[in-house]
């Protein structure tokens, strides 16, 4: 296994259900060695309370909060959270993304200096004709 680790960057606003699902997929399928950096953009759905609970039990989590009342937006959060990440390798990971087994190994295997690596999935159309 590579000794390199990834900082997963996860900004969110009122996506608690998906954020829990996404976090659990990272920890279940990739373990606890990777950092997750969360940003809460003035949520009112319990996101901040949940993030505080996760932070207490997971040492590789950082949490940041916009107390509002104005939202900062996803572009601000990606920039801010990248600055807070402690690893050289960062992965933008939306709150509704799921980490499949070996995602980290595949990303790190393909990564070369100066290159950008992306992962995606293809979904069937929601409304096929």
Which residues does each predicted region cover?
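N-proximal low-complexity "stem/linker" segments adjacent to membrane-targeting elements
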Residues: 1-25
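Short, acidic, metal-binding catalytic loop of nucleotide-sugar glycosyltransferases
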Residues: 24-33
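A conserved acidic beta->alpha catalytic loop
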Residues: 40-49
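Conserved donor nucleotide-binding strand/loop of the catalytic core
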Residues: 52-72
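Glycine-rich, basic loop-to-helix element that forms the pyrophosphate-binding segment
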Residues: 67-85
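Short aromatic/hydrophobic "clamp" motif used to bind/position activated sugar donors
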Residues: 90
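Conserved donor-nucleotide/metal-binding helix-loop-beta segment in metal-dependent transferases, i.e.
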Residues: 104-119
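Short beta-strand-to-loop element that shapes/binds the nucleotide-sugar donor at the catalytic cleft/hinge
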Residues: 117-129
């Amino acid at each position: 296994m590579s000794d390199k680790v990834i900082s997963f960057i996860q900004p969110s606003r009122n996506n608690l259900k998906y954020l829990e699902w996404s976090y659990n997929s990272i920890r279940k399928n990739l373990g606890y060695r990777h950092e997750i950096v969360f940003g809460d953009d003035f949520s009112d759905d319990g996101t901040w309370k949940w993030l505080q609970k996760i932070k207490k039990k997971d040492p590789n989590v950082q949490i940041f909060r916009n107390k509002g009342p104005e939202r900062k937006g996803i572009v601000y959060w990606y920039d801010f959270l990248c600055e807070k990440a402690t690893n050289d390798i960062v992965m933008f990971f939306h709150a509704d993304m799921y980490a499949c087994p070996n995602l980290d190994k595949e990303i790190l295997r393909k990564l070369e200096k100066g290159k950008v690596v992306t992962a995606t999935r293809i979904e069937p159309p929601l409304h096929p004709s």
